[in-house]
């Protein structure tokens, strides 16, 4: 079973809640996503999410608040294949309003450029399906 760790990085600005999201700069068809990555063999999912936030967004000083949810999801393209998903809450107080970052690390997205921005609570429905499944636990 593939294991995935998702990062819900939140902030409050002018009394409004938002979650960090990104688009693939050169592939708009990929939709709006939150940072996530595959848990390596023997790796703790909490360490995965911190690593992925650093590699995908350059936010190497993001602070992990905790695990929000864990589930198992069958993949629509192959129902026999499932993902164990871990959703974590993090904060990154010094993150800019918008920026681009070239992905680092050993994953298949190495070298891609992601355009980051803060997605307000009222636009959470714009996230790629499955990415916002547990945001209701922290953004009200």
Roles of regions detected by a PLM:
Residues 72-104, 117, 137-139:
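Active-site-adjacent beta-strand/loop module that shapes the phosphate/pyrophosphate-binding cleft
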Residues 29-32, 97-140:
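Nudix hydrolase/Nudix homology domain
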Residues 2-6, 83-87, 113:
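Short hydrophobic/aromatic beta-strand or adjacent loop that forms the aromatic wall/cage
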Residues 1-34:
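N-terminal strand-loop-strand
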Residues 34-67:
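The catalytic Nudix box helix
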Residues 11, 61, 90-94, 120-123:
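Non-catalytic surface loops within mature trypsin-like serine protease
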Residues 39-43, 81, 113:
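Short, solvent-exposed loop/helix junctions and linker helices
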Residues 13-15, 27-29, 40-41, 70-74, ...:
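Short, charged/polar surface micro-motifs in flexible loops or helix N-caps
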């Amino acid at each position: 079973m593939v294991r995935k760790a998702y990062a819900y990085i939140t902030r409050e600005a002018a009394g409004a809640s938002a979650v960090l999201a990104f688009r693939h700069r050169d592939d708009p068809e990929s939709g709006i996503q939150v940072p996530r990555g595959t848990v390596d063999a023997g790796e703790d999912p909490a360490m995965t999410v911190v690593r992925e936030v650093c590699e995908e967004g350059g936010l190497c000083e993001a602070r992990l608040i905790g695990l929000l949810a864990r589930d198992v999801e069958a993949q629509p393209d192959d129902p026999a294949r499932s993902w164990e998903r871990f959703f974590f809450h993090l904060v990154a107080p010094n993150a800019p309003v918008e920026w681009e970052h070239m992905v680092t690390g050993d994953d298949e997205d190495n070298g891609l450029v992601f355009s980051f921005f803060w997605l307000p609570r009222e636009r959470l429905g714009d996230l790629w399906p499955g990415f916002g499944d547990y945001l209701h636990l922290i953004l009200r």
